[in-house]
């Protein structure tokens, strides 16, 4: 198993990432996915400040 591979679900090191995050090198990081839809109130944001992809607030 490649420990540096990106994982989009499950445990990330010692914790679980939110749906707005990806696991990269055993660290939760904001996803780089950006959506071209207009959200009048912006995108939904998790407790870490990461935007949920294509999900309006």
Swiss-Prot record:
The record's keywords, sorted A to Z, are: Disulfide bond, Protease inhibitor, Secreted, Serine protease inhibitor
Q: Which domain of life is it from?
A: Eukaryota
Per the record, its GO cellular-component terms are: extracellular region
The entry's localization annotation reads:
Secreted
Disulphide-bridged cysteine pairs: 12-23, 17-28, 30-50, 35-54, 39-56
Q: What is this protein called?
A: Guamerin
Q: In which tissues is it expressed?
A: Not found in the saliva, but in the body tissues.
- Where does the UniProt entry say this protein principally localizes? secreted
Residue ranges of the Antistasin-like domain?
Answer: 30-56
GO annotation (BP), single? negative regulation of coagulation
Q: Which family does it belong to?
A: Belongs to the protease inhibitor I15 (antistasin) family.
Tell me one GO molecular function of this protein.
serine-type endopeptidase inhibitor activity
What is the species of this protein?
Hirudo nipponia (Korean blood-sucking leech)
InterPro entries assigned to the protein according to its UniProt record, in alphabetical order: Antistasin-like, Hirudin/antistatin, Prot_inh_I15_antistasin_leech
This molecule's function is given as: Inhibits mammalian elastases.
Site positions (Reactive bond) are: 36-37
PROSITE patterns to which the protein is assigned, alphabetical? ANTISTASIN (PS51252)
């Amino acid at each position: 198993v490649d420990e540096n591979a990106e994982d989009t679900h499950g445990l990330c090191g010692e914790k679980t990432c939110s749906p707005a995050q990806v696991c990269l090198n055993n660290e939760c990081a904001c996803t780089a996915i950006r959506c071209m839809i207009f959200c009048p109130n912006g995108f939904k944001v998790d407790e870490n400040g990461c935007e949920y992809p294509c999900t309006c607030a």
